[in-house]
């Protein structure tokens, strides 16, 4: 009981799910938005694609891909988004001059965004925001990124040197930093900085002016640590596009302790954790705001009393709309709940009902599943919402016994729940589905055929998709040619429901086929094998071809 309280698990709503309801056309229609937002692109290959197709210059880099949700043209869309940051270490050697590194190359530029569930005809992501300058479905009015995830050095703005903004063919667009949050470089400040950096060029340079500012601590994690080092911070900040078109980073802050009475430690030491703080850093100005999001946490209340000016009270709506429950915290909580959901002392002592994370095949390796975000409609709700979820399997078994979720939207943010499946019924777990995919003669022959043709076959994340009282399983298949410049392309979608497994070119085709099999009452062993189809195009040789026309996959 005390361990559950220490990890915020004492108010979890427990629910029952049959897990075996029949998938029907009506059920699909009722959950259209859930199915519309099933993630088919995976972050790992997508990051490679963004870095090849959306950087345009060697000194730009996408550090990671983040999942978020936006309302675009009245539609709730789950998206991937990445920031195009500047990496001065990747400048050509001849360009690594003092002026370039300190005065000219000062910031990254813009973001790219793509649908989680759509690809072009070539299997590449369908962009919602792309290119330089930024084009697409949202207005990005202040695309300059002076503060980000990169290990940024200090730079000087408002010098006599125009700052590089972005490339425009044979010439470059320039920019001037217009915020006033830097350190004025005049008088004693200028001398102290020159001494600290060991750069007397700063002290005597005729390129600086009275308006010149020094921008320090430009790595956003370093920046928030300088202000509030008593919190620990999530290592996966994510960037958002605000309503005014500016860019901002959201960072989850944690309060931890090793002193909670009679609570089990999750890492051998600390036995209490709360995500009580959200830090928001403006990507342009570097302004930092801390927001308290768990007012019931006594430790964060203590910090608020010690530092009364630390927290900003009012959370802007366009920021709050992008709050995500952090994966790292949820993973800790889900791990602990796998043991401490047991309330019977004898069962707990013998670990008779221990739950663990399932495994899946990802990039052709068996790995432990991570929690993942999904857009879905809970059984008792009228509309879809952003959920972070994790399936469970019993210890040393592969069937799915339950799944845990936490809500992310609006006033329901942070509400946790668990759906249990009946112990007397077998609901397939992720690894069981992976094994059945391996054993399916048609699918395995197709995958082997493409591999033998010189292409690399990559199986993406297997997603468990709860649909009312049943479960759907979806796994994308990437094909990558052997060419050095090739990119992984989504070419097939594997879908499983109960005893049926199909593989088709698109999500819609796979779903349509599953529905036909269910409605016909045909058993899987009665389904004739399909002829091998070896006409799937190999990956694009130059990795840069795209089609304007796209399709739902």
What do these predicted ranges mean?
Residues 1-553:
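Soluble extracytoplasmic regions of secretory-pathway and membrane proteins
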